[in-house]
């Protein structure tokens, strides 16, 4: 009985991982589907059109970082359906941004 307990503890200690891998998950800024394109835009006209929309200059880590990237160039962070010729059709706020 004592041998079983000691053997089980020893086996449990050996089975424990020595190093844990850091897990990274993709950042979800814009919902999948239609509004999947993150853009920085000057003006959001009632969620229908975003004027002077450009792609972020770097890959955002999260929603606040996305907002900061766009704010550096004087624009607003938005998710768009179809960015064409610096205009984006159907825009909304990214997930996690309140203003």
Curated annotation (Swiss-Prot):
Short name of one Pfam family: Hydrophobin_2
UniProt keyword Signal, yes or no: yes
Disulfide topology: 30-79, 40-70
Residues making up the signal peptide according to the UniProt record: 1-15
Localization terms from the record: Secreted, Cell wall; Secreted
CC terms in the record's Gene Ontology section: extracellular region
Record keywords, A-Z: Cell wall, Conidiation, Disulfide bond, Secreted, Signal, Sporulation
Induction: Shows the highest expression in the down of developed fruiting body (DFU) and low expression in the other stages of fruiting body development.
Subunit structure comment from the entry: Homotetramer. Further self-assembles to form highly ordered films at water-air interfaces through intermolecular interactions.
Family assignment from sequence similarity: Belongs to the cerato-ulmin hydrophobin family.
Record function comment: Aerial growth, conidiation, and dispersal of filamentous fungi in the environment rely upon a capability of their secreting small amphipathic proteins called hydrophobins (HPBs) with low sequence identity. Class I can self-assemble into an outermost layer of rodlet bundles on aerial cell surfaces, conferring cellular hydrophobicity that supports fungal growth, development and dispersal; whereas Class II form highly ordered films at water-air interfaces through intermolecular interactions but contribute nothing to the rodlet structure.
Protein name stated in the entry: Class II hydrophobin 2
Annotated organism of origin: Cordyceps militaris (Caterpillar fungus)
Lineage: Eukaryota, Fungi, Dikarya, Ascomycota, Pezizomycotina
